[in-house]
Amino acid sequence: CLIYIAPNKPAITPKVAFKNILQNCLLNRKPLITISGSGILDNFELVINANKSKTQVILASGAILGLDGLRAASEGKIFSVTMVTKKPPNALKSAKFVLENKISLEKLSDPKIIFKGTATEGAKAFPANVNVAAAVGLAGIGPDKTSLEIWADPKLTRNTHQVFVKSDSADFEIKIENMQSKENPGTGKITALSVIACLRGIASSLKTGT
């Protein structure tokens, strides 16, 4: 979902309306806050053109952390970024990619890799599950050069993301274990909180982090 900051109050809109909302923001020169990394990748040319209309498109951190470190490292040279996402089967069983490829996650007893590719491919294959892959790619070496693995792990109760970064300024690892949202097990509770934090940051006179 995304938030269009209107003159009065924000309106929350389904991701399918991303392009129309983005175009309206550009036309009216209004900032856009979103957690839809896949929506940004699908409309990347429009996002790049935001500079021409002096409009800011903000991709909130969502369910991941460490984007400030990735952005800082990208000012130098990043050699590689690998992201490994592991989720309980109930968080992935309704994903379009899983259904289309008839991947069985029932009665799973051991971890099972269900996707391996780039962050671009992963964000488009799992638009409701791994928007964080797009965020990691955009903050760092680029989504086409960011490696991504997605696992279904029956032993987990939380959605887990690990990011491994090698660069000329620092090598670092990021790990987060997100509590599942009751409304959508594929999304972590912290995702909505990241949008609130983003809005507070915009309104605050003090900014922490890159």
Show the residue positions of the predicted features:
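Short amphipathic alpha-helical segments and helix-helix/interface helices
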Residues: 22-23, 43-48, 70-71, 196
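Short glycine/serine/threonine-rich phosphate/pyrophosphate-binding segments
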Residues: 15-20, 42-43, 66-68
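Active-site-lining helix/loop region of Rossmann-like oxidoreductase modules
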Residues: 57-210
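Rossmann-fold NAD(P) dinucleotide-binding segment
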Residues: 1-37
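Structured helix-beta-strand junction loops
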Residues: 28-29, 49-54, 77
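Rossmann-fold NAD(P)-binding glycine/threonine-rich loop
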Residues: 35-56
